[in-house]
């Protein structure tokens, strides 16, 4: 792990009145930052009585650490989540998407977690089979992702990525804002995600766990989601 503890960008939406419900902490996936939770997830849960929080992992969004991004691994990201969780009034429920779900899995094995949800998680076999499938089925998407440069996003790149990351019903303004939050990802973290077959049998330390995916997801298929659920001994 890296020795530094960089400044981390956070967002919070709180209920209008006390509900007694524990806080939620959302962890984003790769190639983006914590802003992705702000249009829908944070306000939706806050309006229903859940204190909702999100962070940008180091090297993403407004968080520091971009200079060391190339050497940043999942354990470093897990340390970021642990730091932010420690600032909350009580232990949060962790909710991670894709790479963020893998970070949550790391934390489940490290120490007790109140409860957790894995949204469209990287499957137990890692990223390599996923990348191989996409290279065959959607070479246009695969080529764009391999050469993604967030500073030079062309219209054809965004059009190729849209059906993989956004609903057809997404608001155009949110779609355009989302493009501003695309970012490079750590090669070390991608390697960690690619080597998941070498992980030990996962430990949940008694935590309640939900594994959730979407039927129309073109990257994390329903089969991938069910494989992760079986890996943890739960139903998707």
Short names for language-model regions:
Residues 29-33, 98, 215:
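Active-site glycine-rich loops that stabilize anionic/oxyanionic intermediates
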Residues 30-42, 223:
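The serine-hydrolase catalytic nucleophile loop
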Residues 44-66:
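Conserved alpha/beta-hydrolase
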Residues 62-92:
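Active-site loop/oxyanion-hole signature of alpha/beta-hydrolase fold enzymes
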Residues 112-148, 187-196:
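Flexible "cap/lid" loop of the alpha/beta hydrolase fold
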Residues 151-207:
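Alpha/beta-hydrolase
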Residues 205, 211-213, 217:
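Short beta-strand/loop motif that positions the catalytic acidic residue
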Residues 218-227:
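Conserved alpha/beta-hydrolase "acid-adjacent" motif
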């Amino acid at each position: 792990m890296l020795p530094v503890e960089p400044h981390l960008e956070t967002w919070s939406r709180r209920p209008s009145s006390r509900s007694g419900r524990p806080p939620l902490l959302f962890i984003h996936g790769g190639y983006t930052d914590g802003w992705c939770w702000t249009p829908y997830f944070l306000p939706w849960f806050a309006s229903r009585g859940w204190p909702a929080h999100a962070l940008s992992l180091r090297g993403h969004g407004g968080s520091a650490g971009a200079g060391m991004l190339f050497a940043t691994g999942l354990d470093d990201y897990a340390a970021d989540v642990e730091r932010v969780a420690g600032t909350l009034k009580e232990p949060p429920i962790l909710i991670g998407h894709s790479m963020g779900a893998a970070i949550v899995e790391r934390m489940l094995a490290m120490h007790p977690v109140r409860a957790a949800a894995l949204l469209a998680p990287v499957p137990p076999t890692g990223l390599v089979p996923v990348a191989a499938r996409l290279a065959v089925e959607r070479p246009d998407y695969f080529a764009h992702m391999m050469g993604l440069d967030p500073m030079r996003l062309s219209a054809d790149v965004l059009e190729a990525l849209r059906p993989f990351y956004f609903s057809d019903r997404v608001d155009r303004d949110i779609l355009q804002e989302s493009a501003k939050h695309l970012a490079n990802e750590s090669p070390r973290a991608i390697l960690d995600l690619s080597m998941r077959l070498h992980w030990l049998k996962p430990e949940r330390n008694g935590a309640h766990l939900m594994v959730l995916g979407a039927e129309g997801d073109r990257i994390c298929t329903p089969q991938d989601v069910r494989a992760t659920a079986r890996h943890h001994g739960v139903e998707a």
